[in-house]
């Protein structure tokens, strides 16, 4: 137990203080505010997705483009490890998609389950994608972000 938790009544009370709520689509979601160390770990996962994940997404994005490899085209340029489509790197697009997926996962993990016996620690993007369309995912991420990072007006009081 830390000094603060001892003074304020225990670690459970501190955990309760770190939970905030927001409403979306008529449902009230509870969000656990991460500690600074947890936020740093989340940021690291989001900004540096695993190479395997990027390669998998890259393969999915470029699978249908292989047919254009032998054809001369200004729209498609094939390099040793990338495909450039209309000036845009598919490898960078894959990394961006992996970063978005990681952000969705990490933010969803901050939700407090209705049933205390349940956990979101092992949730995958595929699980989330099966439940929520992309627009809802982005709305959830924005709402969770608003809760865990108060605006200047809220912080100022």
Task: Please give the residue ranges for each predicted region.
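Short acidic-hydrophobic surface loop/beta-edge motif
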Residues: 15-26
């Amino acid at each position: 137990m830390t000094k603060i938790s001892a003074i304020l009544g225990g670690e459970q009370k501190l955990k309760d203080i770190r939970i905030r709520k927001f409403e979306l689509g008529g449902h009230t979601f509870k969000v656990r505010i991460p500690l600074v160390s947890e936020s740093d770990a989340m940021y690291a996962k989001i900004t540096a997705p695993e190479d395997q994940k990027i390669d998998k997404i890259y393969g999915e994005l470029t699978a249908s483009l292989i047919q254009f490899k032998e054809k001369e085209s200004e729209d498609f340029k094939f390099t040793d490890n990338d495909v450039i489509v209309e000036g845009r790197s598919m490898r960078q697009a894959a990394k961006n998609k992996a970063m978005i997926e990681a952000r969705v996962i990490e933010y969803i993990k901050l939700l407090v389950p209705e049933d205390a016996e349940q956990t979101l620690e092992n949730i995958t993007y595929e699980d989330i994608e099966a439940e929520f369309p992309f627009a809802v995912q982005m709305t959830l991420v924005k709402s969770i972000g608003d809760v865990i990072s108060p605006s200047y007006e809220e912080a100022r009081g």
